[in-house]
UniProtKB/Swiss-Prot annotation:
Record pathway: Purine metabolism; AMP biosynthesis via de novo pathway; AMP from IMP: step 1/2
Binding annotation for substrate: V311, T312, T313, G314, R315, S316, R317
Subunit structure: Homodimer.
Record-given protein name: Adenylosuccinate synthetase
Cofactor: Mg(2+)
Entry-linked CDD domains: AdSS (cd03108)
GO cellular component, one term: cytoplasm
Organism of this sequence: Variovorax paradoxus (strain S110)
Enzymatic reactions: IMP + L-aspartate + GTP = N(6)-(1,2-dicarboxyethyl)-AMP + GDP + phosphate + 2 H(+)
NCBIfam families listed in its UniProt record: PRK01117.1, purA
This protein's UniProt keywords: Cytoplasm, GTP-binding, Ligase, Magnesium, Metal-binding, Nucleotide-binding, Purine biosynthesis
Binding locations of Mg(2+): D18, G45
Lineage start: Bacteria, Pseudomonadati, Pseudomonadota, Betaproteobacteria, Burkholderiales
Active site, per annotation: D18 (proton acceptor), H46 (proton donor)
Amino acid sequence: MSVTTGRNVVVVGTQWGDEGKGKLVDWLTESAQGVVRFQGGHNAGHTLVINGVKTALHLIPSGIMRPGVKCYIGNGVVLSAAKLFEEIEGLEKAGVEVRSRLRISEACPLILPFHAALDIARETYREKGGVEKIGTTGRGIGPAYEDKIARRALRVQDLKHPERFATKLRVLLDLHNHVLTQVLGAPAIDFDLVFDEAMRHAALLKPMMADVSRELNDAHKAGANLLFEGAQGTLLDVDHGTYPYVTSSNCVAGNAAAGSGVGPGMLHYILGITKAYCTRVGGGPFPTELDWATPGTPGYHMSTVGAEKGVTTGRSRRCGWFDAALLKRSAQVNGLSGLCITKLDVLDGLEKLELCTGYELDGETTDILPMGADEIERCTPIYETLEGWSESTVGVTQYDKLPVNARLYLQRIEQITGVPIHMVSTSPDRDHTIMMRHPYLAD
């Protein structure tokens, strides 16, 4: 890396999403000049707490809360213009300048009303057929990615050419309306409603459309530090997650390059975000899941103290013990440079903590999460018991001020996974962060 170029950091979730990436991205943008979303859509939900004020973001990079920081939506993101402007207007009402700082790749596929209709109708169809639901958010993410892979998607750049857009839309809508009405038993979507809304959005989007790949490469060469913000988590990755209970994009660090148009050599440090316990929204295997609905249980403690409800859907998150064998898999596929442990404070007051170090599977033991959902369903976790702590960790900003048992817990995670812990978050507040090694300064 030349001394004249910037240093770039990728932030990824290592579990099933909801690890607290938004807060850490916001915190790290103090050292960055640009923040990039590279996959997913408005199914992501990042919550930031700044000076006691809570802000929920779904599509716009978390760096928008730092004045002067440029924000980019890369080509790997599927874009709902309707939801984007809903989010922009909410931020502008709060006094945040957005439009002059947001750049959107013209190569982003568009999420249109029929994508959400397909998403919801398919889940209903699965349920009626007695098949377990995938657990989609119903936002149209999967169907939009399907159109992209099938090479029939309408992209942001198509909005600049109304006649071309109308022609492509008519063909696409005919296809999807056939599936909606003839296969899924859902109502058809009206062409004029979709087209008219898209044209209204086109006029608003044009000033923000950009060649994001070129702008990022130019910024890097000019010395800017960039931060690539992942959405969801590694175990929701379409290739490396608990398939088919996954999202429709690659959530791993390697996709930061493909999803934004930079070379992999521009990714200098990979920060894995992981909760001090595990949570999951929706269906799919979860080896260390606890009873999180019964008062008085550790799972209930995690659910209530951790306020475990989805930012995007409001659904309750399933809760369980920390899974170090799962984290080994995440470290492997992401090439993690370091870890940030979040929500350590949620474990305050638990007398004993169980740490999953591996699994029993079909009469054998393994120390890493298997690849297939069917295999994971058959896994019985192997636990190591550690002593908890009664002292409060809320707001602690120095590692040596943590309770002894909290430090031992963190050290054991490092030992099992082989990944150093460089940061610890002790509350949702931006400033309640322990820094052992800064990603923008680490070797």
